[in-house]
């Protein structure tokens, strides 16, 4: 069958392109190579113009042989959880309430390819908050290569607003200082130096809706996050044991 031939790699040569930036929808898809063991990333920064669309501007997905980091929405009963809480973004909260991204806005990203599948992304997610004083600015830079994704966030926020870097995972994260391991995913917080990491079991938010999944929450002082995400085996294979 075609499916079997695809799995066996019998349908000709692999494409040369390693990323696709769909500018009309604001979606980026990138992979480190065309082997089964490739590190794959998805990212969103573009038009938010549908009432049923998700508040996922600035969200990333990471995959290597299986999902490493992915929206919690895929593990819900309804499949229609749209809030920022279920996506891999910086979540801004004011008085305990998540600051919403707004329909009718357009975020932007600039993609710069490098060698051997590496690329950088510079995204301005500020427009998605439509002038809300709670979020004066949010920019996200991604540095992607065959072994890891580095995420660098800078932001300005209003008084009383808290920023949380969040990573939704299919398996439970275990925290050790400023690192966390969730199955094959290793998360390392580089900034802020005083970062605290905590874990949410989504089933505690209603097991009839949230059937599985966890969220790693990273908080700290300052107006920036720098976080690296990698497949742990790749790091160990390079001698980081």
Model-based region annotation:
Residues 235-240:
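Ser/Thr-rich, Pro/Gly/Ala-heavy low-complexity intrinsically disordered linkers and tails
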Residues 74-233:
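CBM-like, beta-strand-rich accessory domains located in the C-terminal region of large
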Residues 1-69, 214, 219-220:
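Carbohydrate-active enzyme catalytic cores, enriched for enzymes
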């Amino acid at each position: 069958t075609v499916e079997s031939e695809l799995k066996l790699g019998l349908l000709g040569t692999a494409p040369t392109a390693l990323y696709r930036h769909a500018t009309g929808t604001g979606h980026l898809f990138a992979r480190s190579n065309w082997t089964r063991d490739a590190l794959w990333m998805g990212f969103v920064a573009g038009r938010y113009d549908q009432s049923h669309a998700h508040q996922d501007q600035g969200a990333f997905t990471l995959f290597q042989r299986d999902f490493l980091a992915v929206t919690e929405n895929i593990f819900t009963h309804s499949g229609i959880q749209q809030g920022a809480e279920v996506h891999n973004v910086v979540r801004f909260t004011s008085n305990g309430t998540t600051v919403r991204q707004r329909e009718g806005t357009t975020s932007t990203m600039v993609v710069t390819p490098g060698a051997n599948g590496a690329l950088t992304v510079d995204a301005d997610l500020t427009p998605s908050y439509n002038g809300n004083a709670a979020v004066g600015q949010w920019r996200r830079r991604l540095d992607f290569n065959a072994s890891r994704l580095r995420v660098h966030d800078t932001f300005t926020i209003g008084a009383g607003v808290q920023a949380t870097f969040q990573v939704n995972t299919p398996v439970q994260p275990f925290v050790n200082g400023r690192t966390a391991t969730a199955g094959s995913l290793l998360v390392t917080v580089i900034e802020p130096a005083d970062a605290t990491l905590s874990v949410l079991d989504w089933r505690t938010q209603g097991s009839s809706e949230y059937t599985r999944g966890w969220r790693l929450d990273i908080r700290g002082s300052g107006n920036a996050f720098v976080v690296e995400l990698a497949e742990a085996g790749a790091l160990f294979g390079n001698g980081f044991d």
